[in-house]
Every structure is written in C-alpha cells, then in structure tokens.
Amino acid sequence: MSGKQVYFFAQGQADGNRDMKDILGGKGANLAEMAGIGLPVPPGFTISTEVCTRFSQKEEKIPAEVNEEVLSNLKKLEDLTGQKLGDEQNPLLVSVRSGARFSMPGMMDTVLNLGLNDKTVAGLARKSGDRRFALDCYRRLLHMFGDVVMGVPKRKFEQILQGKKKKLNIEYDYQLSEEALEELLSEYKKLIKQETGKDFPQEAEEQLFMAVGAVFKSWNNPRAITYRRLNHIPQDLGTAVNVQMMVFGNFGEKSATGVGFTRNPATGVKELYGEYLINAQGEDVVAGVRTPSPLKAMKEEMPEVYDELTEITERLEKHYHDVQDFEFTVQEGKLYMLQTRDGKRTGLAAVKIAVDMVEEGLVSQEEALMMVEAGALDQLLHPVFDAQEKKKHEVLAEGLAASPGAATGQVVFLAEDAVSWQEKGEAVILVREETSPDDIHGMNASQGILTATGGMTSHAAVVGRQMGKPCVVGCDRIKLNEKGEFFQIEKKRVKEGDWISIDGITGEVLDGQIKTKPSAVIQVIRGELKPEQSEVYQYFTKFLAWADKVRKLKVRANADTPEDARMAFAFGAEGIGLARTEHMFFEKKRLPFIKEMILSEEEEERRKALDKLLPFQREDFYDLFKEMKGHPVTIRTIDPPLHEFLPRKEDLMVKIAELKASKNPEKKRIRSLEKLLERVKALSEFNPMLGHRGCRLGITYPEVIEMQAGAIFEAACQVVKEGGRVYPEIMVPLVGAAEEFENQKQVIVKAAEEAMEKHKVKCEYSVGTMIEIPRAAITADEIAKQAEFFSFGTNDLTQTTYGISRDDGVGFINHYLVHGIWKDNPFMTVDQDGVGELMRWAVEKGRQSRPDLKIGICGVHGGDPRSIFFCHQIGLDYVSCSAYQVPIARLAAAQIALKERQQGGK
C-alpha cells in the first residue's frame, strides 16, 4: 500500500471531493465536497476503501503506516476544535461510520459518542451543563461499542434496558433518571466483562482503533453481503470509515435534528420536504418516540436556522444537479450538515423532477435521462391502492411481486369462471396453483392473478406483465383444496366469491376490497382523459421523447391481439416483435376447430378443420396489421406441443369415471371423451418442451403452417388493396438446423406467392427464425444464408443452455442466489458469460453470412434494463417486450447509448 490513505475535511477545506467515491465511499466523498464548498460540516477524516481491502487481506489488522496517518489527522482535528480525545476537561467525542461506494443503508456498523469513559463523562457533563445527557451518551456508547466492536449480542443490552424500564414503570429511554442511567452503566460494563472476559476499554485511542476495525469488518457481515447480492453491488469494493466530531441536537431548546429532501420525493413538487425535532437526537426522528414537525414549521420556531438550511439545500441541489436527501443537526443555534446524497424517489417524482430541472436550466436533457431508473417508469402505468384504504386491511400472505399494480376482486379458481363472472360485470382475481396457456382467457378476464407456485418468469408472471395485470406468484402460504373450492392461509379460509386484493408492487395479498385508481397515463391512453388534463401524462411523453432522440435500439412489443397492439403503439412501440399465433387459438369459438384438427387422423380431415380456422386467423392478422400502420409485425408460427390445446389426461379420466358412475350415463358423451383420452395419451411426451413442437410440428404437419402463412398473406394483401402499408415478418420457432428452416421457409414463400397472385398485389415481407437452442446459435452462419432476420428467444435459449426448466427451477434457483452460486437469476437477466456468449457468437456468425441481417430479442429479457444494455453492446437492432415494458425499454436503450457516448464510444 502506498500514498495517502486518510483524507481530512472541515468547513472550507478538504483533501477529497465528490468524484472520489471509489476511494472515500459515497458518504466520505460527499462530506469532503460539502466541506470543500464551505458548508458547515462537523470536521473529521475519512480512511479509504483501500485500507478495508488491505484489512481483510492482513488478518483483520490495520497497517501500521495507516495508524500513524490516523493519529496525525486526529491531532489536526483536535487542534481545529480545541478539544482532545480522552481529555477529562474538554473531551472530543467522535462518530465512527461506514460509507461504501454505493449506498447500503443500515447494512454496516456505526459507533457514536466514542471517546467517553468513566472520567470524560464528567467532563462532558460539566461542558454541557447536563449530567443526565452525558450519562445517556455514555450508555449509548457502551451499548453500541459492546455490540459492534466487542461482539456482545445487542439483545442482551436490550434485555437489561427493558428490565430497568419495567422496574421503574416507564416506557421511553428519555424518562430514565440520572440514578437509573448510572445503574445501567454499571450493568452494561458487567455484561461486557461476562461475555468477553475483557473490560470496556477506557483508553480513547484504543476505542478509536477498535471501532475502525469493527466497521471495516462489518463490510463482510451477512446482511451486507446479502444486500450487495440483491442490489448487484460488487463484493470486493470495501467500505471507507468516516471519523467525525460529534454534534448534538439534544443540547436544549435551541438544538434540533432532522432529515429532508430538496424536493418532495413522492410527488416531485419543488418544496423543502422533511421533518425535525427540537432537543432530540437523530435516532429519535427515525424511532418515532416523539412526533416530528414538518420542516416548514421550523420557519416559525427557528427562523434564522430555517433560512440558512433553505439556502444551503438550494445550493446543494444546484451543485449536485439532482434532488438531495440530507441530514442536519442544530447544536445551540448552529447548523451542521451531516450528510447529503442523491434522494430516492418514486417513479412519478423522478420523471417530474427530471423534466422540471431541464426546464429550470439546471440539467441537460441527456443528464435528465440518467436521473430516472428505467424500471421506475413502471409505477406510472399501473393502478395503485389508495394508501389510507390499504392500511385498514389485513395482510393475509406475501408472495413474489411478479407484475406491478393493484387489483381487487372476488376469488375464482377456474379460467372459465373468471370469464363468466366478468361477463356479468364482476371483478375477479384468478387464484390458481399455477397457470397454463389454456388459462389465457380467464387471465384476461381477471383484474389480477395469484398463484401458489411459480417464479418471476413463470407463465402467470410473464403473461401478467404482458397484459399489464397485477400478479403475485409463488405465494406458498396459500393452500388450495383439491376440488378448488377454497384456499386456506393457516386458520383463515377464503372461498370462491370472497373479496381479496393483491399488490403487484409489494407481493402482498390482502383481505377484502380495497379501492384502486388507474394511473393518469393509462386514463389518457384509454381516452378517459385528454392529454392536456393530465400533467403526469405530459411529463411522461415529454421525457420519453428525449429518450427517443438518443437511443439506437428500436423498441417493439410482444402483442397477440389488436388490443395489445393498440396499447403497445400508444406506449411508443415501433412494431410487434412477437405475435404468438397459438394464443389466438384459445378463444372459445376457435378451440373446437383446433381440437378437431388435432383429433383428425388423416391429412384431409385436418385440412378441413384448418379451413375453418383460417378465417379467424386471417381476421386476427388483418386487425394487427391495421393497428400497426405499416410498422413491422413479427408473427411466430405455431410453437407449443399439440397436447397443450387439449384437456389434461387426469381431468379426462376423472370426468369419464364420473359419467360412468352417474345414474343415467351418456354413452355417446363417454365414447367421445374416451376417444379424446386416447389422443391425449398418444400425444403425451416425457419432456414436451424439448419434444414435438415448434418447427418440428410444422415439418410433420405442413398443412398447419400452410394455413397460418395463408392467413397472414391474405390479410396483408387485403390491407395493401385498401391502400394501407404492411410489413409482415414470419418467424419459425425452435430451429436447430438450417435444413429445418429451409423446409419451413419454402412453405411460407409458396403461401405468400399464392396470396399475392390471387389478389394481384405485391406485399413486402421477410422470413426469419428464433434463435432459442444452442445449436442454432452455433450454426448461425448456415441458418443466416436463408434467414432474413434472427430473434433471440431467450426464455428457451436459457433453459436449453442451462438444462433447467424455468418453472421447475424455482425450488433451487433462489437457494443458488442466496448462497452466491449465481449472481443473478438467468431467467430474468441475460447470463452474459454463457447464454450471452452464444448470442454474441450468433450475431457475429450470422452477419458474416448476411451483413444486413436484422437481429432482435423477444424473450422476457427484452424488458430487463441490464439485458437491454447487453443487447445494445452486442449490436442488436431491436428489443421486444410486453406493452407495459415499452417505456422502460425506451429509457434503458437511451441510457446505454448515453453511457457509451460518455465513455468515448460512437
């Protein structure tokens, strides 16, 4: 280790600045910055993150040269303040706090009031004129130091404290008398001796170095490790340690402590927002022991301090070009700034603040785009619960928050019931063990979806996000009875028709009916509000228009219906990246014909059934083309195995048994069901998702692809004849070999030529493939000789690369994440080293064969900001995601383009 490792700061002077977060951590860098620009900051020094790394490597010892540097800076602090650490007459007290590069609130350790001992406590009492205050500070030090530094369980201090309060019949700490505090000091010191075999150190310098070591050590405590894993923070950064002169807000009626924001973090309104308490310590604001006052009230109680705070916070916001979250203390009328950092805010506030700051001339449009987390835009699109109403309802259970928004409705357990109830005007929540593709109609009819099993990429989760439906999955406290009549949560039974509410932002399941309200953005898109009536919508569209100026990636939407397409287009989608034809088959009127086709044993019979389906498909595609107004529409030919369109084998067996056991068995009905059961058994596969599906189905049943392609081009030609523009892209799924693609392309091209000949019009189109199995990626150069575009189906590409079913993997994926086997869930964020390497290879090889090859992504990863960054880096042309994720993708694509520009890229 070489060079400077300890950095001093005081009002008007600082060794560091805000650009040194890697060295000083976020807290230390901002303290240095505030001090450097002349703000009233309690003086102190920061020990660098590099020392933390060295500390971990050197058997948890602070290097000798760093100790010397610490003592040198301590002397500087003592000279500046006129106080001395450990001095009995005028003791210097300091806080020792962590501060990593990225904010990790509450994850690491802090020690306050360091420097107190049996002698200096008397000096503090004389100096403050308040012996009780001094004793309480010492009590807090023993508690924190004993826990953080000496390893005495915190609960043991709490037990002593609670016992004392119970004995004295008091409720709050501030009610403890001087005598009671002296007794607690004695008991705390005895506890430390009993637990550690050592006395509490009376030497102040010894306390300091022990506390610094403990804070470094806390970088690797379990909660900090977990927090970094969950928030994608590298584990090897280390924390800095900030040693700072203590200031006290509980020195009397001219002292106070508080926290605040330079703008309202919930609404974005430009106002000083926060709370403070007179004659209190910072932890009292957080603990709620006393009700704090709004900062505005300080204007009356402490007008001079309020004016100074207003001036300082306005200066901070202009200096940092962002909303600031600040902490302050007033000691005997003097204001001290303890911390500033960029303020966390809601999605609504984030967009308003970004736009307002551009219009105020505070930031550029490009800077504004980097101020909003892409995922936060979700909050502007989904219905939300009325906050006050929600507080009145019991939380029954919690699951995974799979699709955001708020929904309230009556419980139903079957998709068919959801539809019938909805047709009667009822609002319903569909509750299932898990959902499958044939539940689509019921999911669509529901206000929200709740499943007992499944993960963030389960069918319910993916479809819920696509539909914009609130969805909670993996709620394992819910036990459905076998007949599907009710579900049980411990002693509470919830029956069909009972009202529940689900919160797709928190994952909570609540009892009863809670009032919801749609977002203003959605109200405008639906035509329920005019754009000029919604300030939120105006901010939303203006902000995203800036994003569109800078992004390179196109953004499309996964949409199967005209309604989906209409919503996607309103959200700014530039085409449809995935239209799943099989979802169109599940409509009630069509299911009989698809079943007829599946049950037919001869090709001629199948063609007759398909002829009945063709008009439906043609109408579907016509409506999609009309909605997209000439933008590309990528249509995937049939993908799932045929058995998914038929009833489950077990359900059929039960139904047949019930019919046979009835008093008047319907023989014709029984024979029909038995024939259906035989076909279901014949189509059954051990591993259907790797079986007879995708292009394999199209090759063995070419008449299905002929019908679908015919319907596509009949619809396209009709639009052209009407003077419209259309550009269909037909996508062949599950291709693993160039020969498979060539086979299907021939069928599609023939259908296109026949339709154009019939209608005497020309229609531009292209034929491409999904890249969703490793062999397709590896042989991309061969496939690209025939395919005009690729689209990565990353859901299946991840499954086939890992050899893991995304639904069956739920049971152990979380275990992998918790234990650090994986850093991320590969079904939510592209695994760049494995799946991503296959994608990179496919892009390079594909464009070697066809330089103008268009390449996109249509898996669930298309709406994940970090995956979008990767897609930009490897040169994709577009991403496709659910309609409600289109705004997120537009912003994420802009942000990666800006980052690339900042780093000197093109």
What are these regions (language model features)?
Residues M1-H393, S420-Q422, E426-I429, S436-D438, ...:
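Nucleotide/phosphate-binding sheet-loop regions of phosphoryl- and nucleotidyl-transfer enzymes
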Residues R18-D19, S403-A445, R551-L553, V835-P851:
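C-terminal accessory/binding modules appended to enzymatic or scaffolding proteins
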Residues F45, A452-G454, V473-D476, A579, ...:
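Short beta->alpha connector loops at strand-helix junctions that form conserved
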Residues R97-S98, V521-Q523, L529-K906:
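Conserved alpha/beta-domain cores
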Residues R228-I233, L369-W421, E426-V428, E508-R551, ...:
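Long, charged amphipathic helices and adjacent flexible linkers at domain junctions
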Residues N242, V412, I429-V431, L450, ...:
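Structural motif
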Residues K334-Y336, S436-N444, L450, M456-V462, ...:
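Glycine-rich phosphate/ribose-binding loops and adjacent secondary-structure elements
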